Amino acid sequence: MDIVLYFVAVPILIVLIVSAVKVRGKTEEDNHEARQEVAAQVVGRLQAEEGSNRLRRRRNLNRMMANRMANSAYREAADNDSPVEVEEEYEEAEQQSQATGKRGAKKQKKLEEKQAKRAQREAELEEREERKRTQELREEERRKEDKKERILEQRQEEEELRAKEEQEKREEEEYLCLKQSFVVEEQGEADELTEQESQNLLQEFIQHIKDCKVVLLEDLASHFGLRTQDAISRLQDLLSDGSITGVIDDRGKFIFITPEEMNVVAQFIRQRGRVSITDLAQASNSLINLIPEIHNTA
């Protein structure tokens, strides 16, 4: 009987022990979870308090920065703006230092916009000054170029005037030499003509050549009481200064050719291209009028 009770009691005791162990483990687990939950709540409260403190510190820092910016804006306005603008910005700075939250941000934005407009005005002013300086430099360069061109033109005019004066002087000297060379021989002595007589004789010399069209140089010299060589020299001088135009052939004749006839001959040569002396001589009879003006007048 005792043995039976023993075998019955042992399993029951084992079951009770196992149950007690499980209950104790669950209790410890519940206690651990409870401790973790309490710890999490504590950490949450600490974080919330830290966030609140951080927010307060940030607000204080923003307020401090707003005060500094307001003071700086006031000092800058006092240096650059008019008294009215200084007063306005001072009032804005005072309001900014007292404003908080959304109202303070709005005032800060307004002040920043005003500063941005001022910076834009300064940039536009600097740009206008730069354009003005550039325009002044361009005008200065243009004035220098104009002055240089005027100097060059003046020098060129002076050179042309000097060359013209020299040419006129040279022509005058040649004319005087030619005029003084005409002399008449009377009783074996050469008497110098007056200026008017020399000029008249020169014009008569030229007109005689034009009227004859073709004249022997010996006859020309004899007609004016000159030596043949002197007549040739005077004729060459007249050809050089353009008083008459023509050619001296190899037979001692001078053929007077008008400028118009010269142009006709030149056109004939250009049309033919290559022209021989024979062809030119044959064509000259039709291109150049060789009939004396005296005969034509008659």
From Swiss-Prot:
Residues 110-149 have a biased composition (Basic and acidic residues). Residues 71-149 are annotated as: Disordered. Residues 22-298 are cytoplasmic. The chain crosses the membrane at residues 1-21. The keyword Ribonucleoprotein does not apply. It is found in: Endoplasmic reticulum membrane. Keywords: Endoplasmic reticulum, Membrane, Transmembrane, Transmembrane helix, Ubl conjugation pathway. Component of the UFM1 ribosome E3 ligase (UREL) complex, composed of ufl1, ddrgk1 and cdk5rap3. This is DDRGK domain-containing protein 1. It comes from Osmerus mordax (Rainbow smelt). The lineage of its organism: Eukaryota, Metazoa, Chordata, Craniata, Vertebrata.
